[in-house]
Structure formats: C-alpha cells, structure tokens
Amino acid sequence: MTPMSPSTSPAPSASSGVSSAVSSDGTVLAYRVLGDPAARPLVLVHGWAQSSASWGPELLDALATRFRVVAVDLRGHGHSGVAETGYDSSEQWADDLEAVLDAAGIAGAGDAGAGGAILLGWSYGGIVVSDYLASRGEGRIAGLVLCGAVTAVSRSAGGAVGPAMMAVADGGFAEDPGTAIATLAGFGTAMMRSGDGVSRQRIFGLSLATPPAVRQKLLTRRVDHDDTLRGLTIPALVIHGEHDGVVLPSAGRANAEMIPGARHVGFAESAHAPFLEETPRFLAELDAFAAEL
C-alpha cells in the first residue's frame, strides 16, 4: 500500500474530539486538548508506533485536573496524516510540534500571563522533543519530562534499547499481517510488566494500526541529541521503569546525567509504561515537578 501524501491526509472530524494543525510540509497533525485553559500546558508526545490514545482515558482525565493537556498524534500515527517523507528530519519533527503548539495557543514562558509548557516525551517521543528543543530552543518550554525515553538512534548511551525493541527489526516492518502480529505481540507484551489487559491490548493495537512503512522509517533514521541535552537550562525530570526491556534503564540514567541538574527517578515495578503501571506515583512525580517550576 502506498503511504498517503500530506495533501490527501484526512483532517480529523470535530465529533472525534480531536483538533488539527498543519505542519510546514502540509501534513495534517491531530491533537487532543483537555483540562482548564488557564492551567499550565502539558504536551504529551507518544512513542514509536503509538498515538495519543496510548496514555489511556483514565490517565488523561487525571492529568486534565492538573494541567491543560495537549496530547499529540505524531505524523504517521493515530489520526494524523501519513506523509511520505519527514520521518528522518529533526527540523521537520520540530516543525510538527511547533505547528501543534501554535494551533493550541501555547504561549512562550516569558509572555505575559504564561508560565510555559511542560514537554513530556515517552519512548521515541524523547527523540521528538529533543528535535524540537534543538531546533526551537526553550522559549515556550518551562520543563522537560522524559519517560522511558530514548534521545538517540545511534550508539549514544541515551539511545540504548533492549531486546524487545531490537526484535522488532525481525518482522515489525512487514506488510504481511501474520508476520507483523507475531513480532509486535512480543513488543506489546514487553511494554508493561503489570497493568490491566485493556491497556495492554490497546498498546498492541496501536502498534498494528501504525503503517509498516512509518514503523520502519522512524527506526532507520540516525540521530543523537547528546549535545542538545547537555545544553539545556530548563528543569528536567527523567522517569524510567527498572524492568524496561524496550528502552534500557541505562538510557534513562545516561539522559539524566547529560541534562544539567536533571532528576532521575526509577520506577521499581514498571517496564516501559510507568504512567500505566504505577499511575499514582507517576502523577505524584509530575505534581512535584510542576510545583517547582
């Protein structure tokens, strides 16, 4: 199947509760906004072969009592357009996030009445938020949260992936449904050490719903953001599950060490999705982080 071009990508319907922005190359990007418009923005950037649905309705509702939540669907994922290009470009990923921030009306940290957004990247979302910070800087961002995140697709310590992620290359890009299902089932199982079956099946389903070409393009780019992280001046929180077999816990520690003043928190009962596996603690850590900004 040929990937859809930006010009033919459907805009999400208003009835879906999803809004849309248009990136610099014409790709339609979907996002959801929840919570008090006057609250501090929390921008959620999901991981590889996932979407804004990854966070789950219960967590999104809980976050919406604390923040103005902006949950993004990355290009090629969820309700966003499936562009043919742009997946290997740090500048394009930065343009995508900038388009969503513009459309959602997120002001800069120094603007009157604005405190700046918290940017939260989960898994591959750590690369995307780093792309944004490298290109656009910290002007709109008050704080950074990395959750089970990689910040590189390279030999950088911040890009250390585990066996569950490496196994994806053996069939996770296949168009044959049987091959893809068999491979991604293992990936989905590794996502969570605990948690309900509904959440686990949702995560698995989102991986299958992401076009095979998109799954491949994200993982065949080459990028690292070691210098980006070392140059940050905003507060940062790094959360990582101690049983993560998708992105190794060592990546979380390395990322925290590279960011000046970052706080690292290991979640002892979690694998790759601490926000679903240890939700009360995840919320408490976010509350404490936001209170210090």
Q: What kind of region is each of these model predictions?
A:
Residues 234, 248-257:
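Short alpha-helix in the alpha/beta-hydrolase fold that links the catalytic acid
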Residues 155-156, 175-230:
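Conserved alpha/beta-hydrolase catalytic His-Asp/Glu region
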Residues 232, 238-240:
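Short beta-strand/loop motif that positions the catalytic acidic residue
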Residues 130-175:
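Flexible "cap/lid" loop of the alpha/beta hydrolase fold
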Residues 57, 71-120, 124, 284:
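Active-site loop/oxyanion-hole signature of alpha/beta-hydrolase fold enzymes
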Residues 262-293:
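Catalytic active-site module of serine/aspartate enzymes centered on a nucleophile-bearing elbow/loop
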Residues 27-83:
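Conserved HGGG/HGGXW glycine-rich cap/lid loop of the alpha/beta-hydrolase fold
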Residues 243-247:
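Acidic catalytic loop of the alpha/beta-hydrolase fold
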